[in-house]
């Protein structure tokens, strides 16, 4: 039975192997490739199919010519190839035996020559076939690929990368760049302008990809169409000095406006609440105290629209009142002054107005822009007028938001409830939050399971400037965290998990704080256009002198903004304000207390302490100009508290002391601090434990100390020991 490979049959019939394979598929004969073997039956099928097609082709002359040529090819090619392997072996053996017997006849030699001839012919045909195959592919390789409609890139592209995107040879692009006056190599990076010029020359559109960090909630903020914005309630925070009536005022507003007309309504403390005045709502944040206000602002949460500054009419401006003013001004929030306790006989509102003018809060009655309202939180007098003024300021501020979008806002409070799990009070700042919304809150995520408003009622949806308590989060967020609702729960989950992972890695990465050491570099890089400064000094005169000197410093492109001043020790509140405002704290003849030191280390706030005003001014000016000399850093090694004093003739005052922190060393430099103010700075004259002179005394032990040329030591004084260490500027 005759058998042959597909490529042999194709060659015999002057067809391509592909055409033969297609014919076989049409006859339902399965073959894998051109090397597959077909038997005589299949060949008959093929020839029968081919004859039918040829019969209808209308070219008898060509068929006849092909038929005349085929026998010669059959005789030359098929005879050695189609013979079975066994026959060939027998032929070789018989040929070898004939040679051994000496039968070297012409007939015996012919098959050998014929075999060699056929072998050469076969190789020649194979070479022809390879050449034909190569020639067949060549046009496909050289065929030019079409130009793309658009080229996208991020940042920059090399010449080679751009050539690949344009389906062009790099050499072609290099020539174009040469015409543009740019000498480039294949690996040279091209800027945006060069990429756009080349693509424009080819008529291809260019689009720069903007890489968005999906874990950054801020990147999902889309600017709303002004036509979609609607008026929203103002968010109000009440601030002021201790015992000036902040909490009483909050309670008075709540009792007069929340409970009236809502008999049987349950008021639930969720950290914020709403009141309705003349058909309009006002949201109050129930977070009296500057720490909460400032901590949220330090973490990027600007939630307050208006600040009500409460000042007692019988007490006037107090230290925390000044702090509250500084906090509100640093946040850029309008201030309404509520002069409280007007029901008291000793009330003197004119004195309050006079004192507040020193802090640029001038009453409207005196030609200023600050609204003053006389109120009594106890009797309820002036509450309505105060709320009307809040609405007036809100109207001037034009507070608007788009309710028809996915909600976003800020966490006011959060806690872990034993029965309900993580619970968070959110303030929706834009959009509408609905039950069932997937949500990312800080580094947590979840689905809003239930929402309760400030009246304790379950709600299904809340709009802008509305506080609401939600459940359904996987963890407890922190106050000040931003939240964003999503349409897709999978996306919310992936972003929440990515943010949680990043938080673990970075441990809530700190924002870069301004410090004098790195001030010049930050100015050069354009990161700092304004230096916020907090001044604390021992007396008011020093504060004013320091303020005047600092404001005279003139360095091109940078100005000094004094956000807060005060008299006395540097407190934790000062450090919190500095952290929130990215400020430097300058102390003149004062020291930070223990809490302030710890907070400054945690928040990385730069504290500069001086005893000469000129030195402070010179240091800041040099820092702004990038000319700071290598500095000596003060390292506190110990602190002792004076428990009692003894006066001994010829020796002076001996301080009976107790080491509260670190250790006190005989050779260290010390300073004596009284009520946060430095009274003395010098060295130790004698350090004794019982009657023995000692070199040092560790924490938890008592000792006796005398100071060099100083005897005005009193009980309660703090003696601080320190050494100066030289540090390199970075």
Curated annotation (Swiss-Prot):
It comes from the Bacteria. Gene3D superfamilies: 1.10.10.2480, P-loop containing nucleotide triphosphate hydrolases, Translation factors, Translation initiation factor IF- 2, domain 3. Keywords: Cytoplasm, GTP-binding, Initiation factor, Nucleotide-binding, Protein biosynthesis. Residues 286-289 are annotated as: G3. GO terms for cellular component: cytosol. InterPro entries: EF-G-like_DII, IF2_II, IF2_N, P-loop_NTPase, Small_GTP-bd, T_Tr_GTP-bd_dom, TF_IF2_bacterial-like, TIF_IF2. GO terms for molecular function: GTP binding; GTPase activity; translation initiation factor activity. GTP binds at residues 240-247, 286-290, 340-343. Residues 376-378 are annotated as: G5. Pfam families: EF-G_D2 (PF22042), GTP_EFTU (PF00009), IF-2 (PF11987), IF2_N (PF04760). Residues 265-269 are annotated as: G2. Residues 48-151 are annotated as: Disordered. Belongs to the TRAFAC class translation factor GTPase superfamily. Classic translation factor GTPase family. IF-2 subfamily. This is Translation initiation factor IF-2. It comes from Halalkalibacterium halodurans (strain ATCC BAA-125 / DSM 18197 / FERM 7344 / JCM 9153 / C-125) (Bacillus halodurans).
């Amino acid at each position: 039975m005759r058998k042959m490979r597909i490529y042999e049959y194709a060659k015999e019939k002057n067809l391509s192997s592909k055409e033969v394979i297609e014919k076989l598929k049409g006859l339902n004969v399965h073959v894998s490739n051109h090397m597959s073997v077909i038997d005589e039956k299949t060949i008959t099928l093929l020839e029968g199919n081919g004859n039918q097609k040829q019969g209808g082709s209308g070219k008898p002359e060509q068929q006849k010519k092909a038929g005349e040529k085929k026998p010669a090819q059959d005789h030359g090619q098929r005879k050695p190839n189609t013979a079975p392997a066994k026959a060939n072996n027998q032929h070789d053996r018989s040929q070898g035996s004939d040679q051994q017997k000496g039968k070297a006849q012409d007939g015996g030699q012919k098959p050998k020559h014929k075999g060699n001839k056929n072998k050469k012919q076969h190789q020649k045909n194979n070479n022809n076939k390879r050449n034909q195959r190569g020639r067949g592919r060549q046009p496909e390789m050289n065929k030019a690929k079409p130009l793309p409609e658009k080229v996208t890139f991020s940042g920059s592209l090399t010449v080679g990368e751009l050539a690949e995107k344009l389906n062009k040879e790099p050499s072609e692009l290099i020539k174009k760049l040469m015409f543009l006056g740019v000498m480039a190599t294949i690996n040279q990076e091209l800027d945006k302008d060069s990429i756009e010029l080349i693509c424009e020359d080819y008529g291809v559109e260019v689009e720069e990809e903007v890489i968005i960090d999906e874990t950054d909630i801020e990147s999902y903020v889309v600017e709303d169409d002004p036509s979609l914005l609607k008026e929203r309630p103002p968010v109000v925070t009440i601030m002021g000095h201790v015992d000036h009536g902040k909490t009483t005022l909050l309670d008075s507003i709540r009792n007069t406006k929340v409970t009236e007309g809502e008999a049987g309504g349950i008021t639930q403390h969720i950290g914020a609440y709403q009141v309705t005045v003349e058909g309009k709502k006002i949201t109050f944040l129930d977070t009296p105290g500057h720490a909460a206000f400032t901590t949220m602002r330090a973490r990027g949460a600007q939630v307050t629209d208006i600040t009500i500054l409460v000042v007692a009419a019988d007490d006037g401006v107090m230290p925390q009142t000044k702090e509250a003013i500084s906090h509100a001004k640093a946040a850029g929030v309008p201030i309404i002054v509520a002069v409280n306790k007007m029901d008291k006989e000793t009330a003197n509102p004119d004195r309050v107005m006079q004192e507040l003018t020193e802090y640029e809060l001038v009453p409207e009655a005196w030609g200023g822009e600050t609204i003053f309202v006389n109120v009594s939180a106890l009797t309820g007098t002036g509450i309505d007028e105060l709320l009307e003024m809040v609405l007036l300021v809100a109207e001037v501020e034009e507070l608007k938001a788009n309710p028809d979008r996915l909600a976003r806002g800020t966490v006011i409070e959060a806690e872990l409830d034993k029965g309900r799990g993580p619970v968070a009070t959110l303030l929706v700042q834009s959009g509408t939050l609905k039950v069932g919304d997937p949500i990312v809150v800080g580094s947590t995520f979840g689905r809003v399971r239930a929402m309760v408003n400030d009246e304790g009622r379950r709600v299904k949806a809340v709009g802008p400037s509305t506080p609401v308590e939600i459940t359904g989060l996987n963890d407890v967020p922190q106050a000040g965290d931003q939240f964003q609702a999503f349409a897709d729960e999978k996306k919310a989950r992936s972003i929440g998990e990515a943010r949680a992972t990043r938080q673990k890695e970075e441990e809530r990465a700190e924002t870069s704080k301004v410090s004098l050491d790195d001030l010049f570099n930050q100015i050069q890089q354009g990161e700092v256009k304004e230096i916020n400064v907090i001044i604390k000094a021992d007396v008011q005169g020093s504060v004013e002198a320091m303020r005047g000197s600092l404001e005279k410093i003139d360095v091109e492109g940078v100005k000094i903004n004094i956000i807060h001043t005060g008299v006395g020790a540097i407190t934790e509140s000062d450090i919190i304000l500095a952290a929130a405002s990215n400020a430097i704290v300058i102390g003149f003849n004062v020291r930070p207390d223990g809490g302030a030191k710890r907070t400054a280390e945690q928040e990385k706030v730069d504290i500069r302490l001086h005893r000469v005003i000129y030195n402070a001014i010179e240091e800041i000016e040099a820092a702004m100009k990038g000319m700071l000399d290598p500095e000596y850093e003060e390292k506190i090694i110990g602190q002792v508290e004076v428990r009692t004093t003894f006066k001994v003739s010829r020796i002076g005052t001996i301080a009976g002391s107790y080491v509260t922190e670190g250790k006190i060393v005989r050779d260290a430099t010390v300073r004596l601090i009284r009520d946060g103010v430095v009274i003395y700075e010098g060295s130790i004259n004698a350090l004794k434990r019982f009657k023995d002179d000692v070199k040092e005394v560790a924490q938890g032990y008592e000792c006796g100390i005398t100071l060099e040329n100083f005897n005005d030591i009193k009980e309660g004084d703090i003696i601080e020991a320190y050494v100066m260490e030289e540090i390199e500027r970075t």
